[in-house]
Amino acid sequence: MSIENKNTGVKKVVLAYSGGLDTSAIIPWLKENYDNCEIIAFCADVGQGEEELVGLTEKALASGASECHIVDLKEEFVKDYIYPTMATGAIYEGTYLLGTSMARPIIAKAQVEVARKVGADALCHGCTGKGNDQVRFEGCFAALAPDLKVIAPWREWTMQSREDLLDYLAERNIKTSASATKIYSRDANAFHISHEGGELEDPWNEPSKGVWTLTADPEDAPNQPEYVSLEVENGRVTKVNGEALTPYAALMKLNAIAAPHGVGRIDITENRLVGMKSRGCYETPGGTVMFAALRAIEELVLDKTSRTWREQVGAQMAHLVYDGRWFTPLCKSLLAASESLAESVNGEVVVKLYKGHAIAVKKRSPNSLYSEAFATFGEDQVYDQKHAEGFIRLYSLASRIRALNAK
């Protein structure tokens, strides 16, 4: 179960700790394989739920950690990571709003800060050697703390299954509430929850009702729609139904409103960073409503070239976030450029929630470029349709010349 003790020199390790089976086993494993080093457990509160944090410190200490630091990152996560990313229009492979991906850089940053605070010389995570998260965490560590050693137990130990981990803990009389019958791998934060594994590994299987935990089944959702108003300033949601709220509070309120209507469910097969495809079911109720509202205002205020540019930035940003490149010059540049464009993204949107759908049905903005006087199909006094003839001749000039040359 262990490796040969070639790992000398590490004295203090900060472990990204969740209290789950993997990280519970990592604590004693580190002590056995890294010269009985001191383990500092670190848990990032990114809105995964209070129930996930209850008893966490006691569990970490019982497993062999000397300290447990639980850091509240909820407000910072929404304000400095979710809101800026959404302002770029980032959406991975046309579907995924990057709920897990956005959480990784803030967790990694906070883990490094704890390491500096306690004087650690190593960082440790419980990501598997098959997934994206190992790359995301270690990419952030490289940018923020290249001097610290990184330990990835799943790439070192010989344990391969949940049964192996349970046996390992039992041999050491370390109690755990985990079982070998866990079906799904889940990851939750304030923005979303992801579900992988179980029957989802076969793309021919429809997700069972037991997969979903945050949103109502759209088929069972209310038969009457609900309307929610969002006010946006500089590309950020500032009010929900007229109530001024902090970013985190706004997201929580929208989660509570949209989830009963089954809003925000997706079932995708995505291209992982490490080369393989994986299937995941994601629930993002409040974020889906926010995204719809931002898109609606952008339709009013961005001209054609600005909208095209924003879509290009969004596509690039989605890959940067998904691939763990938050702390890079390009990501910083895209965020800064999007801030400038977002200065005009102001207004109010009413979103209709009904059986899994979130549709913007009303929108207005003081910066709107839409003019009913110009757009009307009826009689108007501001647009001379004869002017279109000259524009069309110039617009199609290259095509005309090409056709003449072909004769």
From Swiss-Prot:
Question: Which key words tag this protein in UniProt?
Answer: Amino-acid biosynthesis, Arginine biosynthesis, ATP-binding, Cytoplasm, Ligase, Nucleotide-binding
Record GO biological process = argininosuccinate metabolic process; L-arginine biosynthetic process; urea cycle
Record carries keyword Nucleus: no
Query: Localized where?
Result: Cytoplasm
A GO molecular function held by the record = argininosuccinate synthase activity
Q: Which Pfam family is an annotated match for this chain, by its short name?
A: Arginosuc_syn_C
Pathway(s) of this molecule? Amino-acid biosynthesis; L-arginine biosynthesis; L-arginine from L-ornithine and carbamoyl phosphate: step 2/3
Entry's EC annotation: 6.3.4.5
The record's annotation in Gene3D superfamilies points to: Argininosuccinate synthetase, chain A, domain 2, HUPs, Single helix bin
Q: How does it assemble?
A: Homotetramer.
Task: State the family it belongs to.
Answer: Belongs to the argininosuccinate synthase family. Type 1 subfamily.
- Please state what the protein is called: Argininosuccinate synthase
Q: Which organism is it from?
A: Shewanella putrefaciens (strain CN-32 / ATCC BAA-453)
